[in-house]
């Protein structure tokens, strides 16, 4: 057998998908990440205040972020199953500050003599960082989730049509690198539809359920590589189940993940009842486990 043929092999088990979740402020992006399996948030100092039970790392510099990922890579066993970066536009600012410091300027457009060289350096640093996240994912079977804010931008199609659409905040090239890297780009919004008024005077908006879109639309960007439904409820459990199904042990783990996050907002009576339920989850049917998750998720979303 030749040396080249000897290198042919088969792929290993699938790794957790890489997720880029976009949405307006307050839609529930942080809740989505906080209810992922055993998350560690990399976030700003004031991020995640509504989830005191979730572990977080609040860096002051880009060097601290890359240093943390390096230390996590060096661990033989990782306590976290998900790494959540909150948010992409905050991370971009950290990278730009690092580039400006290295270039001896306070303006990214003047870094290294200008002409886009500062942006190019920032993009190259992001590519390297995502590569390190991929190494972490491969070594520890860790899911990587990046959250991002959006804003409305005018878009002109080459064919001549023009319209407004939601786009990731920040530098377009920077966000584009994350989009290409991610397995799933999800857009979170509220599903609103029109219904006729009871008095027949016209139509009114109704609905308002929070959802995630998984496929491209003229009004927003989205994609997935897992053949997901085009629209899902905005919850970690709905996404995980659509992605690969939830095994009973995963349902129990989800309850044990979400419950500590919302326990502090419950009455003493409810806490006592839930504490008792958690003692015998192995004997509970899958349907009842999913109902329990839905109840806990609603409490989390309302906070």
Predicted segments, located by residue:
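Interfaces that engage single-stranded nucleic acids at replication/repair/recombination sites
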Residues: 2-18, 27-29, 35-36, 40, ...
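Conserved GTP-binding G-domain of TRAFAC-class P-loop NTPases and closely related GTPase folds
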Residues: 155-253
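P-loop NTPase motor core
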Residues: 90-174
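Hydrophobic anchor at the beta1->P-loop junction of P-loop NTPases
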Residues: 21
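Short, structured coil segments at secondary-structure junctions
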Residues: 35-37, 52, 181
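Short, well-ordered beta-strand core segments
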Residues: 39-41, 144, 185-187
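Conserved nucleotide-sensing/catalytic segment adjacent to the nucleotide-binding pocket
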Residues: 49-116
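Conserved nucleotide-binding/hydrolysis micro-motifs of P-loop NTPases
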Residues: 45-49, 89-90, 150-154, 191-194, ...
């Amino acid at each position: 057998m030749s040396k080249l043929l000897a290198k042919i092999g088969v792929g290993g088990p699938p790794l957790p998908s890489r997720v880029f979740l976009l949405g307006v402020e307050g839609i529930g992006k942080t809740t989505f990440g906080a209810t992922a399996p055993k998350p560690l948030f990399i976030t700003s100092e004031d991020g995640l205040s509504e989830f005191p039970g979730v572990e977080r790392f609040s860096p002051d510099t880009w060097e601290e972020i890359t240093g943390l990922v390096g230390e996590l890579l060096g661990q033989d066993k990782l306590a976290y199953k998900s790494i959540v970066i909150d948010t992409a536009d905050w991370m971009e600012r950290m990278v730009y500050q690092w580039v400006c410091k290295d270039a001896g300027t306070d303006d990214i457009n003047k870094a290294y003599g200008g002409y886009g060289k500062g942006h190019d350096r920032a993009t190259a640093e992001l590519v390297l960082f995502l590569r390190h996240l991929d190494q972490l994912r491969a070594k520890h079977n860790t899911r990587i989730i990046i959250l991002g804010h959006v804003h409305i931008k005018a878009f002109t199609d080459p064919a001549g049509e023009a319209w407004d659409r939601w786009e990731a905040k920040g530098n377009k090239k920077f966000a584009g690198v994350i989009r290409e890297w991610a397995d799933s780009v999800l857009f979170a919004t509220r599903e609103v539809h029109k219904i006729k008024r009871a008095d027949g005077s016209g139509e009114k908006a109704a609905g308002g359920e929070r959802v995630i879109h998984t496929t491209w639309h003229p009004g927003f960007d989205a994609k997935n590589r897992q053949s997901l439904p085009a629209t899902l409820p905005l919850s970690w459990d709905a996404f995980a189940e659509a992605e690969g199904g939830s095994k009973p042990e995963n349902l129990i783990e989800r309850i044990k993940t979400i419950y500590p996050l919302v326990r502090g907002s419950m009455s003493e009576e409810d806490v006592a009842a839930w504490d008792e339920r958690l003692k015998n989850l192995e004997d509970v049917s899958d349907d009842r486990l999913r109902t329990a998750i839905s109840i806990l998720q609603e409490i989390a979303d309302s906070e």
